[in-house]
Design a protein with these regions (language model features):
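N-terminal Rossmann-like dinucleotide-binding module
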Residues: 1-28
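Amphipathic, non-transmembrane alpha-helical secondary structure
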Residues: 2-6, 31, 56-63, 169-172, ...
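Donor/substrate-binding cores of folate-linked one-carbon enzymes
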Residues: 7, 23, 69, 73-182
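Proline-centered loop/turn at the N-terminus of a beta-strand
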Residues: 16-19, 39, 91
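Conserved nucleotide-sugar phosphate-binding/catalytic loop shared by glycosyltransferases and other
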Residues: 27-48
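Anion (oxyanion) recognition and catalysis
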Residues: 34, 63, 118
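Glycine/small-residue-rich loop that forms an oxyanion/phosphate-binding "nest" at active or ligand-binding sites
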Residues: 42-67, 72
Length: 185
């Protein structure tokens, strides 16, 4: 989130963060939003009767601020179909810490991804920003990928740190592809 906020503030990205939503209270993204003056909201499953109700409320909040793109970064739920219905026509993208289609799918998040990459003997890893579609996990069209070599002695933590650096640039580059370009005449 911070890289997006910084890119918007510097003018590097001609966009604004309209709202930050989370499915967990107390996460750093909510603190970053508050410091940047961006509204935020939390939609935990404990607060709602089920996943569909939580995701419907989340989509309503996002639509209410006029968002034209939804960016998932650190969001760890599979979005209910109602989310996409409520936000019809609004693209949804996700940041994944591996080179999809490898090392994606259900359960592949956090350190599990980097551990799987290292256990596979892969020579490189990276990150992927991809489109999100209803009831799918890490299967949408790739928007941006960035690569990093696996170094001798890498651990899940050291690899994760290098991939995170790529993620900060990749997400801004991906958002830029959805921002309308103004043509000068």
């Amino acid at each position: 989130l911070q890289s997006i906020l910084d890119a918007c503030a510097s003018g590097d990205l001609d966009a604004r963060v309209a709202i930050v939503v989370s499915n967990h209270a107390g996460v750093p993204a909510l603190q970053r939003a508050a410091l940047a003056g961006v509204p935020s909201a939390v939609f935990t499953l404990r607060t709602y009767s089920d996943r569909a109700a939580a995701h419907s409320a989340m989509a309503t909040a996002i639509a209410g601020v006029g968002a034209e793109l939804v960016v998932l970064a650190g969001f760890d739920h599979i979005l209910a179909p109602v989310f996409f219905v409520r936000l019809a026509g609004v693209p949804v993208i996700n940041l994944h810490p591996a080179l999809l289609p490898l090392f994606g799918g259900r359960g592949m998040h956090g350190d599990k991804v980097h551990e799987a990459v290292l256990a596979s003997g892969a020579t490189e890893s990276g990150c992927t920003v991809h489109r999100v579609h209803p009831e799918t996990v890490d299967l949408g069209e790739v928007v941006v990928q960035r690569r990093v070599p696996i170094e001798p002695g890498d651990t899940a933590a050291t690899l994760a740190a290098r991939v995170l650096e790529l993620e900060h640039r990749a997400i801004v580059d991906a958002i830029r592809r959805f921002v309308p370009v103004e043509v000068s005449r």
